[in-house]
Amino acid sequence: MRASKTPILINGSPWLLDFRRRSSREFDWEIAEHLEVPEAYFQAYDPLTTWFEWFSRIGYRDYTDAEAEIERDAEENVRQHQVSVQPDLTLTQRLSSEGSIQLPVPFLKTADQFCILSSLLYAGFGVVETRKFHGDTIFLKNVPSVGARHGIEAYVSLDDGRYYYDCEQHRLFSAGYRGDLRSGQIDIVFRPEVYMWRYQTAACLADVYLDLGHILGTLSMVASLYDTSITSRSAEAAPVDLINAVHLQRIAVDGFNP
């Protein structure tokens, strides 16, 4: 049984995500202040009073009758399985193939920056094999993913524009994506609908960052093979509705320096 609500920080501002109601909202200042400084609860408030305050504001579910709640959750999961449709695993069908760039074979022994970029993208995001599992299509990649969902993708900045990396074709497609990137940087994003298309729960956020850790570690390892380095930083995105976002939630930016 998974929580249907969770408080998270977006750009330093606390938000409450409600996966059952498909909504998110920013906390009011009083609650936000406590969320950023949790020790304030123990210094200025009675714990029981504080618990009731949080319960009324956030609306946690009452698990007094745990067995009934578990049964209701199971019924809801069955309903979601029946009506949910797996989203497209890549976004290429939304883009024009005009001006697309086929990347070179990865892992060539060369100092060419474009070849290094090809190796980084293939190692961190590229598809090794496509399979069917319980009626769903899944990608097998060089990096693991919780539940084989692989909902993390890459946009690349080159001198002449921004490109979406098609992990299945190992190809770059011109995209109208706007990011504050310098040439050679990789903008790493996750697609909420891929992680939550069956279970719209807070647990997916932990899955995203587990997957991201594998990707960043792999990129760093490949960069070292080419005697170069990877510089990662958090991506600063405007606080938007995580539940209803189509496919862009920036989580990191990578740049390599030959």
UniProtKB/Swiss-Prot annotation:
InterPro entries: Nitroreductase-like. One of its GO terms (molecular function) is oxidoreductase activity. Gene3D superfamilies: NADH Oxidase. The actions of the proteins TfxB, TfxD and TfxF are implicated in the processing of the inactive trifolitoxin (TfxA) precursor into the active peptide. This is Trifolitoxin-processing protein TfxF. It comes from Rhizobium leguminosarum bv. trifolii.
